[in-house]
């Protein structure tokens, strides 16, 4: 049975309080939906609506920069 915090084994990255960055082993394929990802190497997902692209320095919903008139989550 794989460890629940091991993203490589489970393909699921638990980014909240349940897992520390040490045991998670998140890789490039791991996606997090929050700005508080505690797993090292975990990529935070930032999505802009429509055909808008995220700006530089976007690490999560709180720092997401989209083009004017575009919403971000």
From Swiss-Prot:
Residues engaged in binding Cd(2+) 3: 26, 30, 32, 42
Residues engaged in binding Cd(2+) 1: 15, 19, 32, 37
Binding, Cd(2+) 5: 48, 52, 54, 58
Binding site for Cd(2+) 2: 19, 24, 39, 42
Up-regulation conditions: By cadmium.
Record keywords: Cadmium, Metal-binding, Metal-thiolate cluster
Job of this protein: The metallothioneins are involved in the cellular sequestration of toxic metal ions.
Subunit structure: Monomer.
Annotated protein name in UniProt: Metallothionein 10-Ib
Organism the protein comes from: Mytilus edulis
